[in-house]
């Protein structure tokens, strides 16, 4: 009587102890997506209050919004190269740390210039975080679980814009 173990490569979810649930990787990436998606709507509604604290008009802070979006647009194409070159896990971890720290420092910014620079740094993290996170989930999720994993990644994009305005001071 042979007691051979099943091939782990055929059923990675079973090997990790997760049978039909959502993978930890998908949940972690979904949380990162939520942070990035909520960020835009929180800041957009907080701009008037931020402008008062900086002593400028709200329009002056639009440069921070534009700097973030431009950084995303320029660096997203490099995210695939970075994941291949340095490893998706390393890039995602780096991006998550950069994005989170830049978000915290944005909240503590004392000038418009500081805010804009921190938004650029935050954009660097965001540009790497979302595409590399999605790539990681797609590469590590078994085919039968792919729809559930993609749904897990989609929910933050739907919920965060609803929660952002009240959190930002709507």
Where are these regions (language model features)?
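Transmembrane-helix bundle of Major Facilitator Superfamily
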Residues: 2-170
């Amino acid at each position: 009587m042979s007691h051979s173990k099943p091939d782990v490569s055929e059923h990675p979810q079973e090997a990790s102890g997760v049978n039909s649930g959502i993978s930890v990787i998908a949940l972690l990436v979904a949380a990162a997506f939520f942070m990035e998606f909520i960020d835009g709507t929180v800041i957009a509604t907080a701009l008037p209050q931020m402008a008062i604290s900086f002593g400028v008009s709200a329009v002056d802070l639009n440069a921070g919004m534009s700097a973030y979006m431009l950084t995303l647009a320029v660096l997203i194409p490099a995210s695939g190269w970075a994941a291949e070159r340095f490893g998706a896990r390393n890039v995602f971890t780096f991006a998550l740390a950069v994005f989170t720290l830049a978000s915290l420092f944005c909240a503590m910014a004392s000038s418009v210039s500081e805010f804009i620079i921190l938004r650029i740094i935050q954009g660097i993290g965001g540009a790497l975080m979302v595409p590399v996170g999605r790539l990681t989930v797609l590469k590590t999720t078994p085919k039968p679980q792919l729809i559930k994993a993609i749904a897990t990644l989609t929910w933050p994009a739907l919920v965060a814009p609803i929660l952002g305005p009240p959190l930002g001071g709507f």
